[in-house]
């Protein structure tokens, strides 16, 4: 067991400590269409850790607000939101390769060009590729709830991860989370409320109604038909707030 309190502390001492991952990377099996879309479109829209720290204006060929979606699944929300907001640019991160392929197929069919994608670990992308204060919005919709208590440490929404997000988001930018697991929603709310540099945009101090710009998924509609709830959270960054501790 390591005596270092964090990966950063270990790195400073020249040591490597394996960090807890919030995902299991599953390559899965690509359909022919997904494989063809990746081969055809990746040179244009694909990004990797090897790109290093990005100049987002150069990546997109313009200055525009940038939304980052972490864990875009099959890409439905990413593509629809990019299509509906051509004045914005979008970056998606997904570890499941068939999801990347499906996203590229959908984007090509919709004629969407204001997006880029990573097939990487979100934490590494944030640390290595995303400049500080460069994002206008970070959205994470229906992340893995890791519902067993012993797996809660694998949930992506944790205090250290939120600190990393704030570092990458401009002042006044937004973190938007959504989940259909009430226990995870409560966990998210607690983590975000405990961060002094975030302000809850909910008038009731907890959750917000689903924003019109967040598309409903088929899974979400099915769940609603069965009486399942969905919880959206939106918090705004306020970096002038004093950090406690």
UniProtKB/Swiss-Prot annotation:
CDD domains: AdoMet_MTases. Pathway: tRNA modification; N(7)-methylguanine-tRNA biosynthesis. Residues 209-225 have a biased composition (Basic and acidic residues). Signal peptide: none annotated. Transmembrane segments: none annotated. Keywords: Methyltransferase, S-adenosyl-L-methionine, Transferase, tRNA processing. It comes from the Bacteria. Its EC number is 2.1.1.33. GO terms for cellular component: tRNA methyltransferase complex. S-adenosyl-L-methionine binds at residues 69, 94, 121, 144. Residues 200-225 are annotated as: Disordered. GO terms for molecular function: tRNA (guanine(46)-N7)-methyltransferase activity. It catalyses: guanosine(46) in tRNA + S-adenosyl-L-methionine = N(7)-methylguanosine(46) in tRNA + S-adenosyl-L-homocysteine. It is an enzyme of class 2 (transferase). The active site is at residue 144. Belongs to the class I-like SAM-binding methyltransferase superfamily. TrmB family. Catalyzes the formation of N(7)-methylguanine at position 46 (m7G46) in tRNA. This is tRNA (guanine-N(7)-)-methyltransferase. It comes from Idiomarina loihiensis (strain ATCC BAA-735 / DSM 15497 / L2-TR). The gene is trmB.
């Amino acid at each position: 067991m390591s005596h270092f309190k964090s990966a950063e502390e270990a790195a400073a001492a020249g040591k490597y400590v394996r960090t807890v991952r919030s995902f299991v990377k599953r390559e899965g099996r690509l359909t022919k269409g997904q494989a063809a879309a990746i081969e055809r479109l990746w040179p244009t829209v694909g990004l990797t850790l090897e790109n290093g720290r990005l100049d987002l204006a150069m990546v997109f060929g313009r200055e525009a607000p940038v939304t980052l979606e972490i864990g875009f699944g099959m890409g439905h929300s990413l593509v629809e939101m990019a299509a509906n907001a051509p004045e914005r640019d979008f970056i998606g991160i997904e570890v499941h390769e068939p999801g990347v392929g499906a996203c590229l197929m959908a984007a090509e069919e919709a004629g969407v060009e204001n997006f880029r994608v990573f097939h990487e670990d979100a934490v590494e992308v944030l640390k290595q590729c995303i400049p500080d204060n460069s994002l206008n919005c970070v959205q994470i919709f229906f992340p893995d709830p890791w519902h067993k208590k012993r797996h809660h440490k694998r949930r992506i929404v944790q205090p250290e991860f939120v600190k990393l997000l704030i570092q990458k988001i401009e002042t006044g930018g937004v973190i938007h989370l959504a989940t259909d697991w009430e226990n995870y929603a409560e966990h998210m709310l607690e983590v975000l409320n405990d961060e002094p540099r975030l302000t809850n945009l909910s008038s009731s101090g907890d959750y917000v109604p689903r924003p019109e710009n967040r598309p409903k998924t088929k899974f979400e509609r099915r769940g609603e038909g069965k009486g399942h709830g969905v919880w959206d959270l939106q918090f705004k960054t306020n970096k002038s707030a004093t950090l406690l501790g």
